[in-house]
């Protein structure tokens, strides 16, 4: 097999990476014919670097000349935008040389149109295995669905599930590794489980003396903090492991630094942590995800509504799982407050939604503008309080899951008739204390 080489093809300060394809390229008098050629161009220290398969020096030189013309055409059309840590291959590729690597990844772990794992393999990185979080490596499993270890059919790599028989890599999993890479898109909400997976991966790295490299990604809800700070002495679970607000306003890289710096890992341990930050990002950036972070957050609006509507998972109401608009509506078969109707069905990512095949009544929140959600920048408690009042005669409106999502106080406050303003006021002391902690670990200009 021909070797893979890396060369600089000249400074271009435009978009960090893209894929070029030259179909049926033939070089006269070279003795070679290429039916399919593919080259990755990635930024390394503000230059474009191309990874190509070496065939012949003379041919390679002519081929790069041809591709440079194509690069200039594409680059002229590209504007500067947010760059994720994964896109900055030049920042972390040297760290991987000669090392045995595991990657904590899912469908969001992309470098432009290529998956990070595919990109690393193409560059000759020795990827030994993949650790998969909730929803799996390819992001197709239901929320809460336990997954078994398996083999990825596309790469042949073993996939170790961190949402099955165990949620923390074992010593045996870590034994043959020199480094772990974590690259998963989070949404900045405490009960979204990717930060809990991060916690357990960091613990495993600390306990087994394996360095962790976090490739940072923007937080689409990173422009505010809100909600009750969880009292982990009272309530601690996989949907709430740390004393942070429901909306914490940190990227996954900043969050990892906080877990390390505040000694929140078991036994106060710290792992050897490196974070590759994003570029062109601040906490005032409204970042729309290029790929849905999980099956039931398919749109930017659903991501923005998730902190508010996620609380309804602690009730007997539906958040429209099993429809084309999960987390963009709320309802119940007996919630006759508006003419809107929807019927959940078994679909990929929601095989057994609440009220499967039963018509629900409620509110369609897709009419709320993105601008208003971004401007409001806070959890909406009114929907939850109003729904409770409507069903107040039903003692099973709330379920025990709400305490794990929000802590035990929120249910008590609503049942006692506290207003939204009164409940919000009760959060302020905890939010102020958390803000002091948070500021120590920020990598980006704050809102």
Where are these regions (language model features)?
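Intrinsic low-complexity, disordered N-terminal segments enriched in polar/charged/small residues
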Residues: 2-6, 21, 25-27, 34
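Glycine-rich, aromatic-lined ligand/substrate-binding cores of catalytic
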Residues: 279-356
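Bacterial Sec-dependent N-terminal signal peptides
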Residues: 32, 37-38, 42, 46-82
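Short internal beta-strands
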Residues: 128-134
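Conserved anion/nucleotide-ligand pocket segment
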Residues: 236-306
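Conserved functional hotspot residues or short segments at active or partner-binding sites
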Residues: 326, 330-428
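Glycine-rich, charge-decorated loop segments at or immediately adjacent to ligand/cofactor-binding or catalytic sites
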Residues: 139-144, 213-235
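Glycine-rich oxoanion-binding loops at beta->alpha junctions
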Residues: 148-177, 189
């Amino acid at each position: 097999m021909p070797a893979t080489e890396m060369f600089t093809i000249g400074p271009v300060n435009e978009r960090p990476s893209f894929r070029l394809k030259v179909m049926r390229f033939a070089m006269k008098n070279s003795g070679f014919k290429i039916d399919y050629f593919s080259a990755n161009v990635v930024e390394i220290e503000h230059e474009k670097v191309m990874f190509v398969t070496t065939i012949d020096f003379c041919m390679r030189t002519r081929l790069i000349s041809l591709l440079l013309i194509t690069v200039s055409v594409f680059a002229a059309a590209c504007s500067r935008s947010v760059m994720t840590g994964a896109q900055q291959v030049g920042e972390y590729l040297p760290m991987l040389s000669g090392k045995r690597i595991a990657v904590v990844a899912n469908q969001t772990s992309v470098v432009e149109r290529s998956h990070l794992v595919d990109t690393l393999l193409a560059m000759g990185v020795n990827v030994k295995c993949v650790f998969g979080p909730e929803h799996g490596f390819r992001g197709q499993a239901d929320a809460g669905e336990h997954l078994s270890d398996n083999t990825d059919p596309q790469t042949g790599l073993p996939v170790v599930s961190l949402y099955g028989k165990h949620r923390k890599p074992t010593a045996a999993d870590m034994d043959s590794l020199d480094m772990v890479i974590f690259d998963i898109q989070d949404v900045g909400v405490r009960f979204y489980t990717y930060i809990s997976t991060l916690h357990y991966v960091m613990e495993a790295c600390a306990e087994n003396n394996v360095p962790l490299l976090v490739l940072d990604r923007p937080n689409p809800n990173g422009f505010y903090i809100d909600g009750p700070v969880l009292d982990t002495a009272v309530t601690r679970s996989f949907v709430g492991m740390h004393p942070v607000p429901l909306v914490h306003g940190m990227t996954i890289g900043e969050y990892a630094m906080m877990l390390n710096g505040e000694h929140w890992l078991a036994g106060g341990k710290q792992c050897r942590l490196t974070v590759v930050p994003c570029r062109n990002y601040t906490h005032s950036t409204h970042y729309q995800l290029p790929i849905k972070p999980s099956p039931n957050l398919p749109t930017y609006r659903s991501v923005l509504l998730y902190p508010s509507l996620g609380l309804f998972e602690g009730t007997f109401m539906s958040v429209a799982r099993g429809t084309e608009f999960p987390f963009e509506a709320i309802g119940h078969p007996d919630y006759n407050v508006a003419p809107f109707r929807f019927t959940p069905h078994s679909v990929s990512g929601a095989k057994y939604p609440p009220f499967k095949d039963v018509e629900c009544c409620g509110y369609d929140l897709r009419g709320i503008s993105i601008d208003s959600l971004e401007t409001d920048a806070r959890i909406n408690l009114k929907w939850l309080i109003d729904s409770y009042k409507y069903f107040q005669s039903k003692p099973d409106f709330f379920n025990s899951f709400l305490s794990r999502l929000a802590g035990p106080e929120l249910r008590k406050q609503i049942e006692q008739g506290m207003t939204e303003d009164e409940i919000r006021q009760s959060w302020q002391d905890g939010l102020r204390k958390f803000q002091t902690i948070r500021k120590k670990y920020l990598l980006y200009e704050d809102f």
